[in-house]
Amino acid sequence: MDSLDHMLTDPLELGPCGDGHSTGIMEDCLLGGTRVSLPEDLLEDPEIFFDVVSLSTWQEVLSDSQREHLQQFLPRFPADSVEQQRELILALFSGENFRFGNPLHIAQKLFRDGHFNPEVVKYRQLCFKSQYKRYLNSQQQYFHRLLKQILASRSDLLEMARRSGPALPFPHKHHSPSRSPEEREWRTQQRYLKVLREVKEECGDTALSSDEEDLSSWLPSSPARSPSPAVPLRVVPTLSTTDMKTADKIELGDSDLKLMLKKHHEKRKHQPDHPDLLTGDLTLSDIMTRVNAGRKGSLAALYDLAVLKKKVKEKEEKKKKKIKLIKSEAEDLAEPLSSTEGVPTLSQAPSPLAISSIKEEPLEDIKPCLGINEISSSFFSLLLEILLLESQASLPMLEDRVLDWQSSPASSLNSWFSAAPNWAELVLPALQYLAGESRAVPSSFSPFVEFKEKTQQWKLLGQSQDNEKELAALFHLWLETKDQAFCKENEDSSDAMTPVPRVRTDYVVRPSTGEEKRVFQEQERYRYSQPHKAFTFRMHGFESVVGPVKGVFDKETSLNKAREHSLLRSDRPAYVTILSLVRDAAARLPNGEGTRAEICELLKDSQFLAPDVTSTQVNTVVSGALDRLHYEKDPCVKYDIGRKLWIYLHRDRSEEEFERIHQAQAAAAKARKALQQKPKPPSKVKSSNKEGSTKGLSGPSEQSQMSLSDSSMPPTPVTPVTPTTPALPTPISPPPVSAVNRSGSSTVSEPAQSSSGVLLVSSPTMPQLGTMLSPASIQTPPSSQATARVVSHSSSAGLPQVRVVAQPSLPAVSQQSVGPAQPLPQMPAGPQIRVPVTATQTKVVPQAVMATVPVKGQTAAASVQRPGPGQTGLTVTNLPAAVSPVSKTAMSSPGNSAPSASTTAVIQNVTGQNIIKQVSITGQLGVKPQTGSSIPLTATNFRIQGKDVLRLPPSSITTDAKGQTVLRITPDMMATLAKSQVTTVKLTQDLFGAGSGTAGKGISATLHVTSNPVHAADSPAKAPSASVPSSAPAGTTVVKVTPDLKPTETANSAFRLMPALGVSVADQKGKNTVASSEAKPAATIRIVQGLGVMPPKAGQTITVAAHAKQGASVAGGSGTVHSSTVSLPSINAAVSKTVAVASGATSTPISIGTGAPTVRQVPVNTTVVSTSQSGKLPTRITVPLSVISQPMKGKSVVTAPIIKGNLGANLSGLGRNIILTTMPAGTKLIAGNKPVSFLTAQQLQQLQQQGQATQVRIQTVPASHLQQGTASGSSKAVSTVVVTTAPSPKQAPEQQ
C-alpha cells in the first residue's frame, strides 16, 4: 500500500465539482502527430466545447506569448496584417462562414465523430496507403497497355505513310469483332426466334407452342455481355434541354421484363376480371398519347390545327429544298470552273429555284415510300435499319435516305427528333461512332458497322434488332459527346497543336458601329476582289489572316450567277458562299477563340448578307457551317468541349503559307482532273465552243506550269496593300488569250508529272504521335471515409435493469435509540456519482454479495480537534431482513505493532437480511494483496468491462479458457484509476458468527476506532503509517441501529448515488457457521469520492451515527471518537434513503439520496466507504445491501464512473456470469459462459425461453417470516431479492 500512497492521496483532477457538470473520462486525440488527452464531454457536447474554445478564453485565459504563438498559424496579409488577423479571430469565434463553413464548427464535428482518435487516424492512414498502392498498380497497368497500343499504332501509321502519298487520307483497319462460341450460339438462337416470330406473324398464328411457354426460351439473357451494364446511361443534368432528356430515364432489363410478365400471367390466372386487365376500351392511339405526353412532336400536339398547319408548311419547304439541292448538284457537274473538287458540293448551301425548274424535276428522284420504319428507338437504329435493307451503302446514299426520312411527316413522332436540327449532317459521325472510331465509345464497345476501303461503302455487322436497348443507351451517350466524336485522323490533326494566336488582343466581340462596319466592308470588298490570294483583315487593333477562297485558283472569275441562298444577296460573286463568310468570321475572332454567338455577330457585318436576315436564321446556318468546316480534311476550326469555344486552327499561318498551300491544292486538283479525263486526238475544228474550252484549259495550265516553276524558287514575301478608299470593282472578266495551244495533251501532262514535286513542297506535316493519343482521364479512387465511433448513451430513461423498490416507510423499531439524530449543518456542495446495480447469480452455493457505495471522506486540509468523548447514535432503517447477533472481541490491525487503547462499539438491532457468511470482494487493483487484509483474486473471476471506463489497448482485454472476459491492469492504468482520495474499510468475519441462539436480541460487534484526532498533514490513506500521539484515552463505543424516518433538509448538499446490486438468498434455516478471522481474512475495498453533486430532495433518510460511550468491556481510556456514516439509497418515486455522515463536533454531513439518470450510465463495482483515521486501528464495519434501485429521470447529473473491481470473486459453481457491460438493452443473450448486457425484463424472458438460465424474481416476504432480529411489532411486508437456480416459467418477473 505504501507504493500507492501518492495515488491515493492526490486529489482527483476532474475539474470543478460544485456545478454538477464535472468531466470524467479522458479521451486520447492525435492532433498533427501530438497525442493529447481531452475530456470526453468536451469533445461530445458542443456547448461545453464552445464555452471553452471561445473569444473570452482567447482574451482572458491565454497569455500574450500563447496568443503570439497561435497567431503564427493564421494567414499572413500583405498590408495591416495585425488588424486583419484580429478581424479574422473575431470572425472565427463568432461562428461566421468561411465559404465552406466555420473551422471551429468543423473541428467540433470531427472531435465528436472520433476522427482524431489514434486508432481511427492510424487506420485512415493505412487505408490511404492501400488506396494509393492500388492507384499506382492501376496506373502501371494502364500505361503498360497504352505503350503497347502506341507502338502498334505507330508501326501501322508509318507503314501506311510509306505506302500512300501525303495528301491521301490514311486508311484505317476496321477489325471485325471476334465472337466467342457462346455469343455466336446466343445470336443464332436470337435469329432463330426472330425468324420464328416473323413466320408466326405472317401466318397469323398467335398460340404458343410448348417450347415457347417457358419465358426463358424466348427471352434469353446474353451470356457474353449484358446490354444494360455494358453501356451505363450517364445522367448529366445541365442547363441544356437536350441533356435533361436523359435525367430520369428508367431502364428495364430482361429480368424486369420477365418478372413483369410473370406477374401479369399470375394476375390473369387468379383475377381474370381485374380492372387492370380490361383492355377492351383501349386503343393504340390512346397509349401513344399517354406515352408521348409532354414530348416535343407528340400526338397531342399534332391534333392542334395551328401546329399541324405549321408543320405541314415546314415539311413542304424542306422537301422543296432537298429537291433543289439534288437539282443544283447536277448543274454544278457541267461547270467545273464554278465549283471545283476542292470545295465539297454539300458545303454550298441550297438556293431556291424557280417553279419552272421544279416542274422539270424527273419523277424518279421523288421517292414516295421509304421502305423503313420511320419511328425508331434511336437514330442509330434508323441507320442500321437502312443498312440492313441496302446490305451495303455509301455515305451519300445514306445521307439521301436520312434526308428523305427527315422530310417525312412521321419523323417528328420520334422522341429524339428534336435533338438535332439536321440529322443528315450527323450521318458520318454516327457511323464512325458505331464503327468504334470515336474516342467516346465505352471500353466494352463492339462495332456494329464497318467501312469497306475498296468499295468505299458501309456494311452492317450482326443484327440491330438484337441490341435495341444497347443502341438506345449508346445513342444517348453519343448525343452528349457528339461534339468530340470526330474522325480519328481529324482529331489527331486538329489536336496535334492548338496554334498560338499571332496577335494577342483584349478585344471582346460586340455589335459593330456604323464606322466599324463600313471599314470592314471595304476590306471585305477588296478581299473578294482577289479571291485567289490570302488577305489580312485589320480591325479593332489586331490583324486576322484569312486564306484564299477554296476552289478559286486564279484571278479569272466565272461569269456564272451565284447560287440563290436565303441568307445571302443574289448579286454577290459566285465564289462568295456561306462557308467562306463563316470561315472569315472565325478567323476574325479575338485571339482565334470564341463562341458561336460571337461568330454570328462578326458575320452580321458582312455586306453579302441579305438585309432582312434574322438572328435566328444566322445562328442556324452558322451552326451547320461550323460543323462542315471542322469535318474537312484540313479543318480550320475545332470545338473545345471543356470551355465550349470554337478555336480557329489557322491563326498562326501567314499569307505566304496560305498561298503556298493553296497552290499545292490547285496543282493536285488539276492533276486529278487530268487523270480522270481521257486523252482525245487533236481536232482541227475551230468552233467557238472548242476554242472557249481550250482557252479554259490552256489558261489555267499555263499558270499552273508557271507556279510549278516558281515553286522551286524561294518564296518572295508579298506585302498586302491596304486600300485607302478604293473604288467599287468593275466586273472581272478573263483576260483575252492571244494564242491557242492546240497540243492539249502535252500541256496537261506536265502538271501531272511535276505535281508530285509541288505536293512535296507544300504537303502538311506528319501528325506527331502524341497528338493521336487522348489524354487519360485519371480518376483517383475516393478515399473511404472513416467510420464514426459509436458511443453508447442512455436517454432520459434509466438503465434497463430489474427494479426493486423497498417499502417507502417502516414502523419505528421499539429498540431504544441512544440519541436522537442531530440536525446536520449545511456543507459545501460536494461531488457525487450515480452507480448502477450489478448482479451476480449463483447456482451451487447460495451466497450474498456485498455492494458498496462511495462516500466522501475527510478533506486533508481540515484538522478537526475533538475535545472529548462524545456520544452519538448509529441509526439504520429499512433493511428488510434480520441478522443474528454476534459479539466479538477487539482485534489489532496486522499492520500496527504498537498496542493501542481502543473502545468497543456494539452494533445493535440491525434490521435487514442475513449477514453474509462469506465476503468475496476484490482488493486493491494492481496491488499485491497483503495477508490478512485482502482476498487473493484469480484471473477467471476478475471481470471488468473497461471499455467505457478507461481507454485500454486491445492487448489488455483477453478471454480465458472458460470464455470469460479478463482485463489486465497495468500500473499506468492503476494510477489513472486510483487518482483520488480514498478511504479503506476492513471487512472481517469476526463481526458475524453463530450466536443464533440469542434470538430477540440485537447483534453486537466490536467497532475498533482510534482515539486520536486527524492532523492536517496526514491524509486518510497514510493513516496506518502515520505517527500520531495517543494522549487521549480510548473508550467503548456502542453502535445501535434503529429504524428512523427523517426527511433530508433541502439546504444540505448531498451525494446522490445509486447503489450496486446486493443479492442474497433466504436464510439457510439456521445453518449459520462461525467464521473466524484466521480462516476468512478481511477484504480491503476502495471508494472514490468527489464525482458530482446535486442538491438534496426530501425523502426517507437513513442516519448512521456513531455514539462513543463507556461500556463494560473497556480496553483502555476513552478518547475522541470519529464517526463516519454510510448512506444506502433505496430510491422510490418520491422518497429517498439518505445516510448522513456526521463528523464529530463539526457534524459535517454527507447525504446520499435520489438522483437523476445521467447522460452516460456506466456500471461501477466494489465501492465502499469509510475513513481510516490516524491511529492504531482502522475502522471496521460491514453493511450488507439488498436493494435494487431504478434511477429517477433527470438531466442534471453528469457521471464519470471509475470501476474498481468486481463482486463475486470467490463464488463457486458460477455457471452463467451476468456482468455489467454497455451493450444496449434488448441484446440477444447467447447460451454459455459469456458476458451479457444488463439484465432487463425482456432479456430475462429470453433466458427463460432458452431453458438454461436462472431466474431473478421479486418476492414479497412478510416481516414475520424473517428472523427474530427484526423489530417487534413490524407486520408489514418488505421486498426481498431472491435468486433461484431453477427456471420458473409460471412466475413472470414483477417490476415495482
From Swiss-Prot:
Gene Ontology CC: Ino80 complex; nucleoplasm; nucleus
Chain residue ranges for the region called Disordered: 165-186, 204-232, 663-758, 1015-1036
Protein name: Nuclear factor related to kappa-B-binding protein
GO BP terms, alphabetized: chromatin remodeling; DNA recombination; DNA repair; positive regulation of DNA repair; positive regulation of DNA-templated transcription; positive regulation of telomere maintenance in response to DNA damage; regulation of cell cycle; regulation of chromosome organization
Residues with Phosphoserine modification: S228, S298, S351, S1019, S1288
Biased composition regions of type Pro residues, renumbered to the chain: 726-737
Matching CDD domains: DEUBAD_NFRKB (cd21865)
Main localization of the protein described in the UniProt heading: nucleus
Domain free text: NFRKB seems to be mostly disordered. The wing-helix like domain doesn't bind DNA.
Gene3D superfamilies, per the entry: NFRKB winged helix-like domain
Region of interest (Winged-helix like domain), ranges: 370-495
Compositional bias of kind Polar residues: 741-758
Modified-residue entries (N6-acetyllysine), positions: K1234
Cross-link (Glycyl lysine isopeptide (Lys-Gly) (interchain with G-Cter in SUMO1)): K488
Keyword Nucleotide-binding: no
UniProt cross-link Glycyl lysine isopeptide (Lys-Gly) (interchain with G-Cter in SUMO2), position: K327, K469, K488
Similarity comment text for this entry: Belongs to the NFRKB family.
Gene coding for it: Nfrkb
Domain DEUBAD per the UniProt entry, residue ranges: 39-156
Transmembrane segments: none
